[in-house]
Amino acid sequence: VTESAIDNLTTSEIAAAFGADLILLNLFDTLNPKVSGLEVDKPENTVKKLQKLTGRPIGVNLEPVDEKAEMESTKLQISSGRTASVKSMKAAEKLGFNFVCFTGNPGTGVTNRMIAKAVKTAKKNFSGLIIAGKMHGAGVDEPVASEESVKEFLDAGADVILVPAVGTVPGFTSEELIKIVKIVHKHGGLVMSTIGTSQESSGAQTVHDIALQNKIYGVDIQHIGDAGWGVVPPTDTI
């Protein structure tokens, strides 16, 4: 949302044109809605206009920041419209988002404990699909994904569990992913593996191999991140 591809052309439209089934907006401020390259008559029509142009469901990242998190890196401060709160969730509902994703960008101090809390809050304030989990540590000293945290997200009401794709985060193994997939599927949920640690800017073969391997491990949805030019993945990797 921070960079347009060219004048009056959003990166969301490019992603949709090259095969993206779902569009997830990162760094989007729900209290100050705007997308670079998108012209709207009123800010409150931003999401609806993007849905019309792309023909895709549109979601938003909201970050459940933990003020008490034990950080491994310098903590970054983000706007209130990007954090997971009752106010931002109600704003996302009003804007017309189809789904929310509770996760953390690098250095934001998002913890699994706060993700579970955000899911519970969202069940009362947002009517769309709820995705929950971490793509990487988000600067916090805790396991990125574990069976315990996954169970907490499911019990809180998450529809889709987000995990790092095997091959994107050091130490997260196929054995761990397979166990998580079985837990989620038994609960009736879906699993989304993510390429969110810059591998999306690698060659197409690298992305192909990661996606194929994680599909073999049982995931249902493959995410690809925003580390390419103009904060959209190179089109050949989509």
Predicted features, each with a name:
Residues L38-V40, I115-K117, S146-E147, E176-I178, ...:
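Short low-complexity, flexible loop/linker segments enriched in glycine and/or proline
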Residues I58-E63, V119-K124, V150-L154, G171-H187:
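Short, composition-biased local secondary-structure segments
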